[in-house]
């Protein structure tokens, strides 16, 4: 069994427990009373390379990364540093996240918030909106094509911007065929958990113009952002290097400065 399969098995077990406690109708009622979702696509377009900053306590590849007692405070630092979107891990078993983290971050920041999890049912999309997410991650490798297409459609219908994650050219083709408007290319191999920063430059040419392209994994600092930008990235997603660093706000500001350097503006937007 692959790492992804193990994670999804755990996700389904935890999901069943939540569904037993909170009905879909309850989630829908909460969403109906919630403010409209922020425009995730608009947040990722425009001049320069946008920075998505992640609240991430642990990972399957590295184990514990940071305690993060106050995810809202960390998110506020990210926002103050110039982040365009905050990503919140809500998977508990491998990443140490929760829906409570998502809710706390949403209450603290004004920029769009992404629910990053292993979403396999529409119930999780309703959860995402109910707890304040504006965007939701959908992983091609975790979904059959009909499910991927259905979840993209459902996400959009309830106000979420789906970020469709791919790892290779075939998955990119599936994402495009499913109607993705935002595609994240993850440089981390799901089987080996190793990062290959050349993944983005291989896969990005398969993604048509007009679709927002996000480079995920492997961003250690401004030099990696610039490399991804030169390969066509509209945005980068950064987690580990921020939560393990001494000054997240300053680190984000450095990334944002690199992403808005005049030399990178030509041809972007």
From Swiss-Prot:
InterPro entries referenced in this protein's UniProt entry, alphabetically: Aldolase_TIM (IPR013785), Indole-3-glycerol_P_synth (IPR045186), Indole-3-glycerol_P_synth_dom (IPR013798), Indole-3-GlycerolPSynthase_CS (IPR001468), RibuloseP-bd_barrel (IPR011060)
The entry's keywords: Amino-acid biosynthesis, Aromatic amino acid biosynthesis, Decarboxylase, Lyase, Tryptophan biosynthesis
SUPFAM superfamilies: Ribulose-phoshate binding barrel
EC numbers, comma separated: 4.1.1.48
Matching PANTHER family: INDOLE-3-GLYCEROL-PHOSPHATE SYNTHASE, TRYPTOPHAN BIOSYNTHESIS PROTEIN
Matching NCBIfam families: PRK00278.1-1, PRK00278.2-4
GO BP annotations, alphabetical order: L-tryptophan biosynthetic process
Catalytic reaction list: 1-(2-carboxyphenylamino)-1-deoxy-D-ribulose 5-phosphate + H(+) = (1S,2R)-1-C-(indol-3-yl)glycerol 3-phosphate + CO2 + H2O
Record protein name field: Indole-3-glycerol phosphate synthase
Record family assignment: Belongs to the TrpC family.
GO MF annotation, one: phosphoribosylanthranilate isomerase activity
Record-linked Gene3D superfamilies: Aldolase class I
Pathway(s) it belongs to: Amino-acid biosynthesis; L-tryptophan biosynthesis; L-tryptophan from chorismate: step 4/5
CDD domains in the cross-refs: IGPS (cd00331)
This protein's encoding gene: trpC
Top-rank lineage group of the source organism: Bacteria
């Amino acid at each position: 069994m692959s790492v992804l399969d193990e994670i999804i098995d755990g996700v389904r077990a935890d999901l069943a427990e939540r569904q037993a406690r909170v009905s879909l109708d309850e989630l829908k009622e909460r969403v109906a009373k919630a403010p409209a979702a922020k425009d995730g696509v608009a947040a990722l377009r425009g001049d320069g390379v946008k920075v998505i900053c992640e609240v991430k306590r642990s990972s399957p590849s590295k184990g514990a990364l940071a305690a993060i007692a106050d995810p809202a405070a960390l998110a506020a630092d990210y926002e103050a540093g110039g982040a365009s979107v905050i990503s919140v891990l809500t998977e508990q078993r491998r990443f140490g996240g929760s829906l409570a983290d998502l809710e706390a971050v949403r209450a603290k920041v004004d920029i769009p918030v992404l629910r990053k999890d292993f979403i396999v049912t529409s119930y999780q999309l309703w959860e995402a909106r109910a707890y304040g997410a504006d965007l939701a991650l959908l992983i091609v490798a975790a979904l059959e094509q009909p499910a991927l297409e259905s979840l993209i459609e459902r996400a959009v219908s309830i106000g979420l911007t789906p970020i469709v994650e791919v790892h290779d050219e075939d998955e990119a083709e599936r994402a495009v065929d499913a109607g993705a408007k935002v595609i994240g290319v993850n440089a981390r191999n799901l089987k080996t958990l190793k990062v290959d920063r050349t993944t983005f430059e291989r896969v990005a040419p398969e993604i048509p113009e007009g679709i927002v392209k996000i480079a995920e994994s492997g961003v250690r600092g401004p030099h990696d952002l610039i490399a991804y930008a030169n390969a066509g990235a509209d945005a980068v997603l950064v987690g580990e290097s921020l939560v393990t660093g001494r000054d997240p706000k300053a680190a984000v500001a450095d990334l944002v400065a690199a992403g808005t350097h005049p030399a990178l503006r030509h041809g972007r937007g």
